[in-house]
Amino acid sequence: MPFALGQRWISDTESELGLGTVVQVEGRMVTVLFPATGENRMFSRNEAPLTRVIYNPGDTVESHEGWSLAIEELTEKDGLVVYHGIHSETGEKASLRETLLNHNIRFNKPQDRLFAGQIDRLDRFGIRYQCQLLRHQLATSDLLGLQGPRVGLIPHQMWIAHEVGRRYAPRVLLADEVGLGKTIEAGLIIHQQLLTGRAERVLIIVPDTLRHQWLVEMLRRFNLRFSVFDEDRCVEAFADHDNPFYTEQLVICSLELLRKKKRLDQALDADWDLLVVDEAHHLEWTEEAPSRAYQVVEALSEVVPGVLLLTATPDQLGHESHFARLRLLDPDRFYDYDAFLAEENSYKDVAVAAEALAGDAKLSDAAINSLTELLSEKDIAPSIRLIQAEDIDSELQQAARSELLQELLDRHGTGRVLYRNSRASVKGFPKRIFNAYPHAMPEQYLTAARVNEMMGGRKTLEAKAAQALSPEKLYQEFEDNSASWWKFDPRVDWLIEFLKSHRSKKVLIIASGADTALSLEEALRTREGIQATVFHEGMSIIERDKAGAYFAQEEGGAQALICSEIGSEGRNFQFASHLVLFDLPLNPDLLEQRIGRLDRIGQKNDIQIHLPYLQDTAQERLLNWYHQGLNAFELTCPSGHVLYSEFAEDLLNVLVGGDEDELTNLLNHTQSRYKELKHAMEQGRDKLLEINSHGGDKAKAIVERLAQSDQDTKLIGSVIRLWDIIGVDQEDKGENSIILRPSEHMMFPTYPGLHEDGVTVTFDRDTALSRDDIALITQEHPLVQTGLDLITGSDTGTTSVAILKNKALPAGTLFLELIYMADASAPKSSQLYRYLPPTPIRVLLDKNGNDLSAKVDYTSFDKQLSAVNRHIGSKLVTASQPILHPLFAKGEEYAQAAVDELVAQAREKMTSQLTGELDRLESLKAVNPNIREEELEYLRNQMQELSTYLNASQLQLDAIRMVLVSHV
């Protein structure tokens, strides 16, 4: 496309932005400023979804100063158009450069198209109106952003997303126990922030090994197209912008990249709205010497308004490390470690009071005294009387308990910045059943161990332990690469027999290294022809996806998936319930990570954990330490990290060559310390935090509403009709799924997101969750949103003529149906749509100008209408022009009255909600320092901005349908 500075263009997909101006043309990119909203958009010059705006003689245009010009002719110079005509205020000849046009000008007036004979098919008018209604319905939903993602409707996840996602610039720590879905919670929050306009630019920092996993997760689950940035990508992007991070809105990168000063400086200068940091517990910090990684995240968290930290539970982190994460979120609030510890001790009284309220029993005197002291600024006596009363409605008592709990949550603890769910507070997890299978140590391994000992060599204790735990690796060091250890290792024989006896079961096998995983696949294939696939760090993301899909396939798929330690990070396989641990990792957290591939919320079966091991070896001793010392196979062990840190040296000595007495002594000490830590964690459980994190009945209510929305057959019908009209080919594939393909008769030349080879979709959430290759279609899905935008952003369905066959009315009776849109140009981030989203207003006029829309509903009226061809329709319009012109003026009067009422309601709702929230937060700030001043300032500014935008609300005629009565 030929672009020049100052040219005026309109966005095909975001027409609400108004008239745009080209402000930069550089390399392959063009930047357009939309003055109505103050927003910039950067597009690829070759594929920009933009339409050039050039008016014709006879049109009237408005200047940015407010005067109009009746165009008589136009000229072009240096790619810019100059309009010449008559000035509306002076009546003299004048010229107007296109750069000085009013940016709020609306385009393609339906009445102009109607009188020009550009008449659309009847069904297109209907689908346009349905599209406007769907957009309004979505914009007004308080669950916006929660329905679209391809995730299970799990209460605590939806609750956290609902609470955090609707905040301005949320700064929170997501610290759920392993398996409870922190990544999904973060994705839901990101999705909601983007969809509502609270955020536009997002940076996700993850460990290097998880970059592509996050990329796939964001795309498959949330339909968010992130870009992975590494050094090569930064160098390549330099051609388009001095700062590579400005070339994309959604970016994933590793901490390694940002350790480089140049890249960190660029990231700091990139105006992110939201920063997400995964595995934040690896950021080491002490007051005297914070790590480089911690300093990188700290620098970013100081300039990025919203921050999400995904981390291990506070129990696993230890107090100082937990404080370090909170300090990143709010350094003013968490400024001193000793002060933090003192405050934490005061939470115990709050926890006792919360536990009393969360139960059903009468409150003790101690609990009442504690509540009275904690909520001293509020009169809680009426609520206490309700709770203590004998003969009173249980719902009233429960409401009183809930109200006091909410007061505690608002005023005390870290509930606004920390969310931590535990398995103790979230139900729905399966049992873990441990099965161990002893085998004799092969002579070949014993020989390799003796040779290794004779050769000596300096090795750390940890390296020696690693060798002892994986004898097959040591054996291969002394044999050539083709040495087939799997031909004599009894664990391999056991594995083959196990798979043969469980033919119908999917089995996940995890080994420590990629070489071991590849050798096992070779053994299964060559010895028994067992269908297995591998999954390791040497494979590309596409290869791993294919392996995962092959394993997930029910018919004709692999029976077993063999993963390496690193290769399995971040991947979950809940559809399998058998886990074979071919060896054991040295770290309890890695063991939990392995089991966590299956032991996740949503797993429907008990998990069978199988461990073949070699007797009288380091493998057996480590098994005993995990099983007898930590009970780590059958239960999660939040204290595993602490216990390993404390007993690592003793454990390594036992593994490398300790005797039975040393092992017994280690087990006794470990068991004793395990019980101490478990008791301390139980005592220190923050009941208030748990209640706030899982959401209770409120979370269940959100999930019930989302489930009802999934079953909305009316919505499904509207979406299918939309695709029919656009020309999308739909092939029923069975199993609740449809294949969508562009047909030869597409209404639009391109349909972003719909590929030539098609896409498989479903309206059923369970089907989508069981198949990675099937997209879940909801109102929020890009394929639906794009379809709505294509229709409403074009002139499709803006004019129509129909016949009403009704002998009760005189032949020739005329009705004029007008669809207006009430809206205002405002940045998405202003949240104006919460109060005045683009709203369709229907007016149905008879020939006398009476509005019948309240008496004649759209659906029943539409069913009685018949289409006419364009030629006849054009003649009917021409013949009816004398009647139509005054009706348009009358229709606008009715619509304007409706808009005035909508604006008044929007203003009242906005003032009520924001004033109420501001008053609440201001009063809470006096007793809870977790309320940030930025949040209060944001609310004050938002009220002023929204009031200005509401004053500038506009009425636009969107579609016209002329209806004539016929008896033929």
From Swiss-Prot:
The keyword Nucleotide-binding applies. GO terms for biological process: regulation of DNA-templated transcription. ATP binds at residues 176-183. Interacts with the RNAP. Has a higher affinity for the core RNAP than for the holoenzyme. Its ATPase activity is stimulated by binding to RNAP. Residues 163-332 form the Helicase ATP-binding domain. Keywords: Activator, ATP-binding, DNA-binding, Helicase, Hydrolase, Nucleotide-binding, Transcription, Transcription regulation. Belongs to the SNF2/RAD54 helicase family. RapA subfamily. A motif (DEAH box) lies at residues 278-281. Transcription regulator that activates transcription by stimulating RNA polymerase (RNAP) recycling in case of stress conditions such as supercoiled DNA or high salt concentrations. Probably acts by releasing the RNAP, when it is trapped or immobilized on tightly supercoiled DNA. Does not activate transcription on linear DNA. Probably not involved in DNA repair. The keyword Transcription regulation applies. It is an enzyme of class 3 (hydrolase). GO terms for molecular function: ATP binding; DNA binding; helicase activity; hydrolase activity, acting on acid anhydrides. It comes from the Bacteria. This is RNA polymerase-associated protein RapA. Residues 491-655 form the Helicase C-terminal domain. It holds the Pfam family Helicase_C. Its EC number is 3.6.4.-. NCBIfam families: PRK04914.1.
